[in-house]
């Protein structure tokens, strides 16, 4: 059952984020052209340059979808709406009561979270996660001003390493030895696949100087914050337990906080985020949507696809942890490109095929160990049931 659940989660992530990726490319790379008028018979194509606005709408949609998901999943339940949505645990008294009833400290082998007079320890971690994620996404977009998209993608392929490092450094977590092997194999394989892609005919190779030091520093900070985000999410599930916080509840609250933080940033005249003639990203986005109202169709579809995909992401995070989740997300690019090879008859270099083999070796180890863990848990469960019957 564990392996089947992992397959369902991975398949859902691949499907939804394949659609999400196509819409993201359309929004960021495809020009929008306004209808010709007497005053402007030959309108110039425009590009949507408000990534912070996109992320804000994405977070709002994700909050709504998470709320609907929780309510539908718990329909017929006797719980109050605040309990279903996990809102009652966001107060100091609520988290103390829930932790005590759920016996989080006994379940996870850790001391119960320290009770604060002013803020729930769970809410403080939600705020931290939202701030880390919001900042990381903006650093990624800013890095594209200085480095090429392939360079950023290549760096993102090594995301497993900072996630593993942050889990160990920040929260002193220990992993089974096979996890380190899987991280190494998948990272190496993805790097080989991305680094040795043959250059497309008719396109000149970019000089190494295009990847400036500023862009690489921003990219590195993006990876570090991504690793801190995933490891902190892991720590929340480990510290408070699934009886206290569920994947849907984390998705709801985290995205609501992210939407608030990013909406606030949208209204601030930050030089790095503004464009010529517009003091804020909000004014930039509003001006663009007024000129090209058809962009709303792509924005809404993009946000909806991302929100549905996040449900699968948070379920995977809750059930299997951040390392397995990031293994799925970083290999999504590889499977997408392999699909492109099959459909459009693209060619891969020998080193790329080696990278594919290395990644599949890592995935095979992960699947084998997950199956062993599932069988071991089944044996333990059967033994407990047998002992209960004898008693």
UniProtKB/Swiss-Prot annotation:
Membrane topology summary: Multi-pass membrane protein
TM stretches of this protein: 3-23, 52-72, 126-147, 178-198, 207-227, 250-270, 298-318, 323-343, 347-367
Record's subcellular location: Endoplasmic reticulum membrane
A Pfam family per the record: UAA
SUPFAM superfamilies: Multidrug resistance efflux transporter EmrE
Keywords assigned: Endoplasmic reticulum, Glycoprotein, Membrane, Sugar transport, Transmembrane, Transmembrane helix, Transport
Keyword Amino-acid biosynthesis applies: no
Residues the record marks as carrying a glycan: 230
GO biological process: UDP-galactose transmembrane transport; UDP-glucose transmembrane transport into endoplasmic reticulum
Cellular component aspect of the GO annotation: endoplasmic reticulum membrane; Golgi membrane
GO molecular function, one term: UDP-glucose transmembrane transporter activity
Function text: May be involved in specific transport of UDP-Gal from the cytosol to the Golgi lumen. Involved in the maintenance of optimal conditions for the folding of secretory pathway proteins in the endoplasmic reticulum.
UniProt protein name: UDP-galactose transporter homolog 1
Species annotation: Mycosarcoma maydis (Corn smut fungus)
Lineage summary: Eukaryota, Fungi, Dikarya, Basidiomycota, Ustilaginomycotina
